[in-house]
């Protein structure tokens, strides 16, 4: 079993447990250059809010910094944006789905920023 298969196995187990809870899910996906966050409905079929480093507003804010979006500063910005969008959609609490990634670095920065912006998990 290689690194990617292990991550996907962990992600699958997490999603099964979150589905049993029937709560909104904040899913994070990380690549070398970007980070993405989505809030899914409790049934898991609809995306209620999303934010990523590919958005024009985010890219403009990150333009003065080095890198495009593969750093902790970008993850912090995305965490704040996803919390604001989720609260605007009427979602106060979510279950955090790290998609099998270690809770460290950019994933942790996004989660901490979302908590500071008022999202509960």
Swiss-Prot record:
Cellular component terms (Gene Ontology): cytosolic large ribosomal subunit
Keywords carried by this UniProt record: Ribonucleoprotein, Ribosomal protein, RNA-binding, rRNA-binding
Pfam entry (one): Ribosomal_L18p
GO BP: translation
Source organism, top-level taxon: Bacteria
GO molecular function terms listed in the Swiss-Prot or TrEMBL record: 5S rRNA binding; structural constituent of ribosome
DNA repair listed as a keyword: no
Role description: This is one of the proteins that bind and probably mediate the attachment of the 5S RNA into the large ribosomal subunit, where it forms part of the central protuberance.
Similarity-based family: Belongs to the universal ribosomal protein uL18 family.
Quaternary structure and interacting proteins, as annotated: Part of the 50S ribosomal subunit; part of the 5S rRNA/L5/L18/L25 subcomplex. Contacts the 5S and 23S rRNAs.
Protein name according to UniProt: Large ribosomal subunit protein uL18
């Amino acid at each position: 079993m290689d690194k990617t298969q292990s991550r996907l196995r962990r992600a699958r187990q997490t999603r099964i447990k979150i589905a049993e809870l029937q709560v909104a899910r904040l899913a994070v996906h990380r690549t070398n250059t970007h980070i993405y966050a989505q809030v899914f409905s409790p049934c898991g079929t609809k995306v209620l809010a999303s934010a990523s480093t590919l958005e024009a507003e985010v890219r403009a804010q990150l333009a003065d910094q080095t890198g495009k979006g593969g750093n902790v500063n970008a993850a912090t910005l995305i965490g704040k944006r996803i919390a604001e969008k989720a609260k605007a959609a009427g979602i106060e609490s979510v279950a955090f789905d790290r998609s099998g990634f270690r809770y460290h670095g950019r994933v942790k920065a996004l989660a901490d920023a979302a908590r500071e912006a008022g999202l509960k998990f």
